[in-house]
Design a protein with these regions (language model features):
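Extracytoplasmic "Venus flytrap"
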Residues: 48-81, 175
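Flexible hinge/capping segments at coil-to-helix
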Residues: 154-170, 256-262
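Short, low-complexity, disordered segments immediately C-terminal to signal peptides
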Residues: 31-54
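C-terminal motif of bacterial Sec signal peptides marking the signal peptidase cleavage site
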Residues: 25-29
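A local structural motif
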Residues: 56-59, 89-102, 117-119, 188-199, ...
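Short helices/loops that flank or line small-molecule/ion binding pockets
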Residues: 107-118, 133-135, 166, 188, ...
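Pocket-lining segment of extracytoplasmic ligand-binding domains
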Residues: 126, 194-290
Length: 347
């Protein structure tokens, strides 16, 4: 009886073990099958969750420079704007309203940042650096354009060389990338004490030249080739002095960045897509730029090359130009205080 009981116990334990093993195999197989069929859904869910974690404010306020008072951005951001995805991509993260503000020059844009009426600014390196040096709470999120030319223009019967400017008046937009070029150029030529530099917006330059109020005007892209087309002459260009070429920068306010740390990547992803597209569709882009700026297409083509818009946010050439501009402004006392480039870049 005891022997039979022992055998029964062994049999029961063995049967139980077999049953447990079968159950484990079944569960494992079902789990594997379930995991295989549900994996894509889990990935899609995590992507949606990642998007859901980024929530931008409902209104985005963007400032940019338009010497002709046009309402359309003209760089790669303008391309993305015209194609609709500048807004559609950011709407995925909660933005519902886009406000665009155009300014005649950089210092005016800085004033708007100071007043708290902008979140993002796209403008020249000199006003952006001067603003930061003066305490403007901005962070650099990309170098949008590099190697921007300047044309120092005079009347056909006016000065022919830089030396001819001695004792005369010249003009440009104060606080702009053109002003940095002009002041640097005069210093290089030893003329900084013999030439008076006046503040004048590009739109007013031609009339001042025609009246003889000034001997030359330092024009930005667009305006420079346009005025040359009318018969004026360039006695110098920034392209002859590679260190004096300008850059266009994009900044975001520190308050906006602190509340929305993912914004720089979202913005730069849109911009990179736009740059790739305009490189593949340069003729269409030149026409779009012409329509947005009011300049003829041939003037737009004479103003810049497509590769002046880098795909990456911080190209080495751009960083070198920005740092050189900052150094000049600080050395000349034009920027209130120095700061490191690294501390300015949004991390």
């Amino acid at each position: 009886m005891k022997n039979r009981t022992w055998k029964q116990k062994v049999g029961l334990r063995f049967a139980g073990t077999l049953l447990l093993s079968a159950l484990l195999i079944g569960v494992t197989a079902c789990g594997a099958k379930e995991k295989q069929t549900s994996a894509p859904a889990a990935n899609a869910s995590s992507t949606s969750a990642a998007q859901g974690e980024i929530k931008l404010p409902e209104t985005l306020r963007i400032g940019f420079i338009s010497a002709n008072n046009n309402k359309t951005i003209t760089g790669p951001e303008g391309w993305a704007q015209s194609k609709g995805y500048l807004e559609s991509e950011l709407k995925k993260y909660g933005v519902k309203e886009f406000k665009y503000f155009n300014f005649p020059n950089g210092p005016n844009l800085n004033e708007a940042v100071t007043a708290g009426t902008l979140d993002v600014g796209i403008y020249g390196d000199t006003p952006a650096i001067n603003g930061k040096a003066a305490g403007l709470k901005t962070k650099l999120i990309n170098i949008s354009q590099i190697n921007m030319n300047v044309w120092l223009v005079a009347k056909p019967d006016g000065p022919k060389t830089l030396a001819d400017l001695k004792g005369k008046k010249v003009a440009t937009s104060q606080g702009s990338y053109m002003s940095r070029y002009l002041i640097s150029l005069l210093k290089e030529q030893g003329l900084e004490n013999d030439v008076k530099v006046l503040h004048l917006l590009p739109a007013d330059g031609e009339a001042a030249l025609a009246r003889g109020d000034i001997a030359a005007y330092a024009y930005p892209t667009g305006f420079g080739p346009l005025i040359l087309k009318k018969g004026y002459v360039a006695i110098d260009e920034a392209s002859k002095h590679p260190d004096l070429l300008g850059t266009s920068l994009t900044v975001v306010t520190e308050d906006y960045l602190k509340a929305n740390p993912a914004f720089p990547k979202l913005w730069n992803d849109i911009r990179t897509r736009a740059v790739k597209e305009i490189r593949a569709n340069s003729e269409e882009y030149f026409k779009l730029y012409a329509d947005g700026s009011g300049y003829p297409v041939d003037v737009v083509k004479a103003s810049f090359q497509i590769d002046q818009w880098p795909e990456e946010a911080f190209p080495a050439k751009g960083l070198t130009l920005v740092n050189a501009t900052k150094k000049f402004l600080v050395d000349q006392g034009l920027a209130k205080k120095d700061f490191t480039q690294d501390e300015w870049i949004a991390k």
